[in-house]
Amino acid sequence: MASRPDGDVWNIVDNDKDSQHYGRNFKFDFSYISSEEIKDVVKDYVWQNYRVGNKSLSSLYNEVKACFFQFIRFADTRNITSLKGLTNTDVDHFISYLHTTISERTKKPFGTGGQRVILNTLKSIIRWCQLHRPNDVPVTEIFTGNEYIGVNRKLKIDFIPDDVVAQINEALKTEENPYLKYGIIILQSTGMRIGD
């Protein structure tokens, strides 16, 4: 079977003898993708990666069934019908969407690891398209690279300069709002940073 299957539902049996899923039938269902343009890109991505052997069938299945599904839910709410028009702002909004989405399975928000996997699936599809279907993705870079910082990376914290802290302390003497005043005092005692 050298050509891509027709239709929105594909049944592919894992025939890799070294795979733990050898002989398992994977039912890929692309019908949840409302945009025909995005659907065609994702089908190509799955088929080419499967045929070449870049990714295991189970990995591709999980990417399409769980991870990319979340992007399509987001895209439908924002009327995104093409990957070509994606911007860094869309990626930021997608990350915010992932922060606030409740998992249907666990009834809890997605953990940071799950959010990273979902975003990496979108990145993987975009990166693949940059090589194989460059006309279907943005020309400019839409990922900053620090969307989800790894745990082993050096954490850089921007501290507030001493002269600014002195100005804050002077202003606290005359601050009338008790919530603001004591909130800043608590932040200072716990290590206030610029981001706070």
Each PLM stretch: what is its role?
Residues 149-179, 189, 193:
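Long, amphipathic, Lys/Arg-enriched alpha-helical "connector/arm" segment
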